[in-house]
Structure formats: structure tokens, C-alpha cells
UniProtKB/Swiss-Prot annotation:
Residues 147-261 form the C-type lectin domain. Residues 85-135 form a coiled coil. This is Oxidized low-density lipoprotein receptor 1. GO terms for cellular component: extracellular region; membrane raft; plasma membrane; receptor complex. The gene is OLR1.
């Protein structure tokens, strides 16, 4: 071996006295670049992991925000759906009420229409009756009531007995004279719904002070009873009036309504 063989010298240096090579130094030298590379890789991996953790945290926060936003949107949507359902329910109820109202109004309108048609028919009938009445000459003048053989008129104003007598005479009539229970019942029915007093043609005067009709005939006994006090102190005498079906005696000077009476023209009615 010569000095010019450096490899041989290196091999000699690497050999142990027993002829074996010292591998520890050589191995450490060979693994140093690998260790550095591994350290760099570990550092890069650590940085990567840190970056991933940071990104994961950001993503997690973003997901939480999105979930919160989604939850909020779901709450809003649920509220809108609930409000829409309530609105639909209210609309259905309103529609139902409106339908019932329309049906009720239609029913009332139908009833009104029927009543209107009935009134129209009655109006036509009334026109026919009035037309016939205009051409009919009855036993009593217009505005007089006919009962059996007599005509009766109820005054529209109140006067004393003497003035009421004059009014009846001007109508070619006389104050009421009741000759029968049937006639009394008729008069009672005619004034049943009135509370006013009506003069009759019955009075009590000097010198006899007995109840006499205008024609001088006396009152038929037991035909009706006269209530009230009879006084001879009345200058105009005591006169009779009928009120609510009962005959009363009173001062002739007082005012009351009256009932005029005259014979019906039965020949004209035939």
C-alpha cells in the first residue's frame, strides 16, 4: 500500500485493531441529512397542523354561525308558516261567516220578495175594491158605519153636549139613541179600543128630571145602568156619555166626543 492511496488510508483508519471497521461514526454522519430533513418535515407538519387547527376553528365558527343563521331562518319560517296557517284559518272562518251571512240575506231577500209580491197582490185587490166602492152607493154616507137599520159617525172633535147635538143636526142626524142590547153591544165594540168619552142623546132636565132621549121618549128600563152622581145644580142639566162600554152621568157643559146616528137608506143598498 502506498501513500498515494487515500482510500486505503481511510480504510485503515476505519478499521479496529482486531481488523473490524468502526461503523458508529460513519452511520452518524450518513443519517445527519436525514435527521435534518425529518426535523424540517416535522416542523412543516406542525405548522400545517396548526394551520389546519386554525382553519378548522374558523370553519367551526363559520358552521356555528351558519347553523345559528339557519336556526334563525327556521324560526322565522316557522313563524311565517304559523302566521299563514292562522291567516288561512281566519280567512276560512271569515269565508264561512260571509257565506252564512249571504245565505241569511238571500233568505231574507226571498221573504221580502214574497211579502212584496203579496202586498202587490193585495194592492191590486184593494184597487179593485176601491173601484167597486167608488161606483157603489151604500145605505150610509161616506165615513159612516152601517149597522142593521142605522148609520153611525164618531166625531173627530170634542164639544159640550149642546154643541154636539147641533153638529149632528147639521148632518141630518141626532145623537146616539140605544134601543136594544144588540145596538149597545155594537157601540161597545166600536169604542172598545178608545179611552175617550162619547156624548149620547140622553139627558135629564127640568122640570121632570127624568132620563129622556132627544125625541122625548124615556130610557128603556134595565137596558143599561147609568153610573155617576146626578145633580140638579147643573145649569145645563145632566147628560149621559158612554166610555169603555159603560154609561155615565155628567154635567152637560163639559166637552166630550160624540156619536151621531141616523136611519140607513136600505132601499139604496138593494
Amino acid at each position: 500500500m502506498t501513500v498515494d492511496d487515500p482510500k486505503g488510508m481511510k480504510d485503515q483508519l476505519d478499521q479496529k485493531p482486531n481488523g473490524k471497521t468502526a461503523k458508529g461514526f460513519v452511520s452518524s454522519w450518513r443519517w445527519y441529512p436525514a435527521a435534518v430533513t425529518l426535523g424540517v418535515l416535522c416542523l412543516g407538519l406542525l405548522v400545517t397542523v396548526i394551520l389546519l387547527i386554525l382553519q378548522l376553528s374558523q370553519v367551526s365558527d363559520l358552521i356555528k354561525k351558519q347553523q345559528a343563521n339557519i336556526t334563525h331562518q327556521e324560526d322565522i319560517l316557522e313563524g311565517q308558516i304559523l302566521a299563514q296557517r292562522r291567516s288561512e284559518k281566519s280567512a276560512q272562518e271569515s269565508q264561512k261567516e260571509l257565506k252564512e251571512m249571504i245565505e241569511t240575506l238571500a233568505h231574507k231577500l226571498d221573504e221580502k220578495s214574497k211579502k212584496l209580491m203579496e202586498l202587490h197582490r193585495q194592492n191590486l185587490n184593494l184597487q179593485e175594491v176601491l173601484k167597486e166602492a167608488a161606483n157603489y152607493s151604500g145605505p150610509c154616507p161616506q165615513d159612516w158605519l152601517w149597522h142593521e137599520e142605522n148609520c153611525y159617525q164618531f166625531s173627530s172633535g170634542s164639544f159640550n153636549w149642546e154643541k154636539s147635538q147641533e153638529n149632528c143636526l147639521s148632518l141630518d142626524a141626532h145623537l146616539l139613541k140605544i134601543n136594544s142590547t144588540d145596538e149597545l153591544e155594537f157601540i161597545q165594540q166600536m169604542i172598545a179600543h178608545s179611552s175617550f168619552p162619547f156624548w149620547m142623546g140622553l139627558s135629564m132636565r127640568k122640570p121632570n128630571y127624568s132620563w129622556l132621549w132627544e125625541d122625548g121618549t124615556p130610557l128603556t128600563p134595565h137596558l143599561f145602568r147609568i153610573q155617576g152622581a146626578v145633580s140638579r145644580m147643573y145649569p145645563s142639566g145632566t147628560c149621559a156619555y158612554i166610555q169603555r162600554g159603560t154609561v155615565f152621568a155628567e154635567n152637560c157643559i163639559l166637552t166630550a166626543f160624540s156619536i151621531c146616528q141616523k136611519k140607513a137608506n136600505l132601499l139604496r143598498a138593494q
